[in-house]
Swiss-Prot record:
Main enzyme class: transferase
Gene transcribed to yield this protein: lipA2
GO MF, any single term: lipoate synthase activity
Cofactor, how bound (note): Binds 2 [4Fe-4S] clusters per subunit. One cluster is coordinated with 3 cysteines and an exchangeable S-adenosyl-L-methionine.
Record's protein name: Lipoyl synthase 2
Radical SAM core domain span: 62-286
Amino acid sequence: MPQQSFMNGSSLPREFPPRLPSWLKRPIGRASELSTVQQIIKQRQIHTICEEGRCPNRGECYANRTATFLLMGQICTRACGFCQVEKGQAPMMLDQDEPRKVAEAVQLLGLKYVVLTSVARDDLTDGGAGWFVAVMERIRQDNPATQIEVLTPDFWGGMGRERSQKERVLTVTKAKPVCYNHNLETVARLQGKVRRGAKYQRSLDVLRWIKEFDPDIFTKSGLMLGHGETVDEVVETLKDLRSVGCDRLTLGQYMQPSLDHLPVQKYWTPEEFDQLGEIAKDLGFSHVRSGPLVRSSYHAGED
């Protein structure tokens, strides 16, 4: 595949968010559909990454009566340079009724496949691993036919470091989600700038451990392009993911949420995403979603 086509994107000004290309603009969705999902969520005082992360696909997903639930509050103990979720060092107490509320929302939305994610909670003794399990158990109790995908942080932090991190990953893996997602987000060279508090190898370890613990669980990871990565770096990252047995992949475009976030360095074109998607398939990923508006849980239940 010729690589010249990847080099056409120019660097963009750092002073302000540049105008979005036409392929990144999405319809909002019908008000009635948006209102139904939002009411179910707001009435139960639970959170979704769709809202907290200002996902560009939330109109489409809400129209299909789906949402990705954000567990353990909306304040994150990390400060990743790309993420819209609120940051802080004094997160809220856990809502002990959250498992029931999420399970009820799953039932009301009629979800047969649900994605659970969370803020990073480095303040909790187990990083929140046990909370994922508690929510999963309640969903299964009330919705026995519903399949569950999880998207977790790296569970690094607190005491014990690597040993504790591995135990936390095992805790969630033992609960047997149908798919376990942990995002690398960017290439190795840009990890420090994009993912403060995270490490490239540490995230690869998470994905490797899952497969070691339970080879039957699908593993998944994703990258947000547009931080200044090169094609060669992206391909090398995909190879690293395959080396730890990662099954599924998402590739999407980073869009700067505000002036306080990292600026976009390049808008990758739909054609470039298609080319990367073909490379990923050739490398052996069983499921690939690659496009400017693709996000971690986009059409997740259709994989």
